[in-house]
């Protein structure tokens, strides 16, 4: 399953060719992010990913008591695959071969997909395919606001 999905996760498509995901979440609304059989370090990476979005004003992820939830599972992946968002099941899969910082960025990237964002080229973005270093930027926040409105206005 990883190999088939890896082909989707590492390739970029023209946005006009993308099929809307089944599970897209309002990033300004409460959203529980739960580690699936995650250890303490993996849970910390989930919290760090939520904080990365919080640093640019996206406030929803990791609030307790949320009606909606996204799972995060960690495990082995094909070489060169860092993670993917299984929108049919609302689960983010993350390679367990990554460092803590890389895991947080990959989770933040996959949360971007859960918010409805697609891969970005031409500028530094958490939504760059294969990204392991760029955290969510103000431009990424702007992309979220273009889809959902500005969280600060709610």
Residue ranges of model-derived segments:
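Sec-dependent bacterial lipoprotein signal peptides
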Residues: 1-10
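Zinc-dependent metalloendopeptidases
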Residues: 12-154
């Amino acid at each position: 399953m990883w190999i088939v999905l890896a082909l989707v996760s590492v390739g970029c498509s023209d946005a006009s060719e993308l099929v809307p995901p089944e599970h897209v979440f309002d990033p300004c609304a409460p959203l529980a992010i739960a580690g699936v059989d995650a250890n303490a370090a993996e849970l910390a990476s989930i919290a760090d990913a939520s904080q990365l979005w919080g640093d640019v004003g996206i406030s929803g992820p990791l609030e307790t008591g949320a009606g909606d939830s996204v799972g995060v599972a960690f495990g082995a992946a094909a070489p060169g695959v860092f993670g993917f968002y299984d929108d049919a099941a609302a689960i983010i899969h993350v390679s367990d071969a990554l460092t803590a910082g890389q895991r947080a960025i990959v989770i933040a990237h996959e949360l971007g997909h859960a918010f409805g964002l697609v891969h970005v080229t031409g500028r530094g973005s958490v939504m760059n395919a294969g990204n392991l270093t760029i955290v969510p930027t103000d431009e990424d926040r702007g992309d979220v606001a273009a889809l959902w409105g500005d969280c600060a206005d709610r």
